[in-house]
């Protein structure tokens, strides 16, 4: 993924989906996009832009705990992380004041919904999430496996 070059001077309310294989660097690539957006917003701003990271992973085993910790350590301290394994739409709407929202990762979120074994809840949450993304006036960068 390091061969990609993305300009931050694009539509300010764009929605971006970063796809890749497991451990392919997609989170790091998405974080680079967020950093580009941050850098473009910080110029001339009175206050630093707010970056909201919605993490959907659940630390259910040692390997996942280590991965979550590594991701947190890799991000700038000023980025606010919100852990939300199920109710993603509610969290997106709650972050209406953020300048940029990063969601990592949709694959884990869908897996979490499937594990609830409640088809109606899953359909409702997916529909609500799609509406929340559509209605969101901030750029959203989303990460998912292929």
Roles of regions detected by a PLM:
Residues 40-48, 94-98, 116-131:
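Short, glycine- and charge-enriched coil/turn segments that flank and shape catalytic ligand pockets
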Residues 12-94:
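Conserved P-loop
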Residues 49-52, 99, 139:
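Residues at the starts of beta-strands that form the adenosine-phosphate
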Residues 122-146:
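Substrate-engagement module of ASCE P-loop NTPases
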